[in-house]
């Protein structure tokens, strides 16, 4: 289902935990990371599509999350021609998305990436709200930045852009999900420095 301009209605999901860390999923057999997203089916509201995609891609149900906010308007990105199937070139331009900010109220063990026959992700992790977006496929980076920026106003404490260190490299490394009782591996400076 495309609009008159050739954009497919879609939802995007920014899932945060109690520390305002963001859930990132690694695409199956790829080295790129992204947020859960998916198309809105005929007759679905954006909220219904969001809950369906959240369960299909992450394994979480409505009782595992709380809706914190959503974007005011559609955010669009165009898909380069070489990513578009030949038979729909000329008609399909890209995606227009309503983005939702969700707080996870469930536990990390509630995440199930293998709920469907064709999973989207093969790994996941929590990371700072502001992270360099070079691990995201290039044509989606701008819409990610706009969604993160617009939805940051709903965070319970300010999430300011963090200094860019090696966070992009961190997303590329293989890690298992961090347990909430494990100490952070980040080093902190003493207050007198």
From Swiss-Prot:
Its needed co-factors are:
a divalent metal cation
Q: What is its EC number?
A: 3.6.1.-
Pfam families, alphabetized: NUDIX
Q: Does the keyword Acetylation apply?
A: no
Region annotation Disordered: residue ranges?
174-193
Q: Where is this motif: Nudix box?
A: 38-59
User: Which superkingdom is the protein from?
Assistant: Bacteria
Q: Which residues form the Nudix hydrolase domain?
A: 6-149
Q: Which UniProt keywords apply?
A: Hydrolase
The yes or no answer to whether the keyword ATP-binding is present is: no
GO molecular function (one): pyrophosphatase activity
Q: Which PANTHER family match?
A: ADP-RIBOSE PYROPHOSPHATASE, DIHYDRONEOPTERIN TRIPHOSPHATE DIPHOSPHATASE
Give the family per the record: Belongs to the Nudix hydrolase family. RppH subfamily.
Role noted for this protein: Accelerates the degradation of transcripts by removing pyrophosphate from the 5'-end of triphosphorylated RNA, leading to a more labile monophosphorylated state that can stimulate subsequent ribonuclease cleavage.
Q: What is this protein called?
A: RNA pyrophosphohydrolase
Annotated organism of origin: Herminiimonas arsenicoxydans
Upper lineage ranks? Answer: Bacteria, Pseudomonadati, Pseudomonadota, Betaproteobacteria, Burkholderiales
